[in-house]
Amino acid sequence: MEPVDPNREPWNHPGSQPKTACTNCYCKKCCYHCQVCFLQKGLGISYGRKKRRQRRSAPPGSKNHQDLIPEQPLFQTQRKPTGPEESKKEVESKAEPDRFD
């Protein structure tokens, strides 16, 4: 191993940079080319600027989806008042004809 020159910056030490330039190729050899290639190509990590995706605009003939919802009255439940005695009688009358003894 070569001795480290204290007068040089760490990124200029021998062996710190590859001899060939980075490429856009994603083959195994190019993915392990250098640490930057490994992070970007091999692991898919990039710290660069992210492109913003454009939202798809609505077709010109369509309306706003909020305009289509009409105002609706509050939902009210309507129940028949039944006592516990009536429900027992209904259950007994329904259960008797179904017996297969």
UniProtKB/Swiss-Prot annotation:
Annotated region described as Cysteine-rich, given as residue ranges: 22-37
Site residues, Essential for Tat translocation through the endosomal membrane: 11
GO CC aspect terms: extracellular region; host cell cytoplasm; host cell nucleolus
Positions annotated to bind Zn(2+) 1: 22, 33-34, 37
Chief location category: host cell
Superkingdom: Viruses
Modified residues (Asymmetric dimethylarginine): 52-53
Region (Interaction with the host capping enzyme RNGTT) residue spans: 49-86
Keywords per UniProt: Acetylation, Activator, AIDS, Apoptosis, Host cytoplasm, Host nucleus, Host-virus interaction, Inhibition of host innate immune response by virus, Inhibition of host interferon signaling pathway by virus, Interferon antiviral system evasion, Isopeptide bond, Metal-binding, Methylation, Modulation of host chromatin by virus, Modulation of host PP1 activity by virus, Phosphoprotein, RNA-binding, Secreted, Transcription, Transcription regulation, Ubl conjugation, Viral immunoevasion, Zinc
MF terms (GO), sorted A to Z: actinin binding; cyclin binding; metal ion binding; protein domain specific binding; protein serine/threonine phosphatase inhibitor activity; RNA-binding transcription regulator activity; trans-activation response element binding
Name of the molecule in the record: Protein Tat
Annotated organism of origin: Human immunodeficiency virus type 1 group M subtype J (isolate SE9173)
Lineage, uppermost ranks: Viruses, Riboviria, Pararnavirae, Artverviricota, Revtraviricetes
Gene: tat
